[in-house]
């Protein structure tokens, strides 16, 4: 509140995710110290260079810049279609936990806030539909 210098600093830092977005693969990927991509033969199934997630799951971990992410993915319509593939299995059921490297894992940090990105894409009904299912499947009741 009123700290414009730090606000500017952190707004800029929040955009650093773009340094890890590989537009050739369409995923967030690790880089080497020299700036080259760590794996030239990137395979989404390989999670060796990620912590508790995959490139597909880390892609959506940009809650502070959804507009920028959607732009990188080719616009809101393409981003929404991609989110649909991320959250839903081929049979149309929600794929929100234990569904594989290319789907959400909402019991884990990299994916946990991703359903709300639909709100920023102008499709809030997706968030309202998925979050009760997520709550029932992933939150342990005491």
Residue ranges of model-derived segments:
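Active-site core of glycosidic bond-cleaving carbohydrate-active enzymes
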Residues: 1-142
């Amino acid at each position: 509140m009123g700290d414009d210098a730090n606000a500017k600093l952190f707004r800029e830092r929040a955009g650093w995710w773009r340094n890890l977005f590989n537009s050739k693969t369409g995923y967030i990927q690790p880089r080497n110290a020299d700036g080259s991509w760590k794996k030239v033969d990137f395979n989404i199934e390989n999670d060796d260079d990620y912590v508790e997630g995959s490139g597909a799951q880390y892609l959506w971990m940009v809650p502070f810049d959804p507009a920028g992410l959607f732009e990188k993915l080719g616009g809101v319509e393409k981003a929404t279609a991609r989110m649909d593939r991320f959250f839903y299995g081929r049979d149309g059921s929600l794929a929100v936990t234990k569904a594989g490297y290319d789907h959400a894992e909402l019991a884990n940090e990299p994916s946990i806030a991703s359903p709300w990105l639909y709100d920023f894409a102008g499709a809030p009904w997706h968030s309202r539909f998925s979050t009760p299912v997520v709550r029932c499947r992933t939150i342990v009741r005491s």
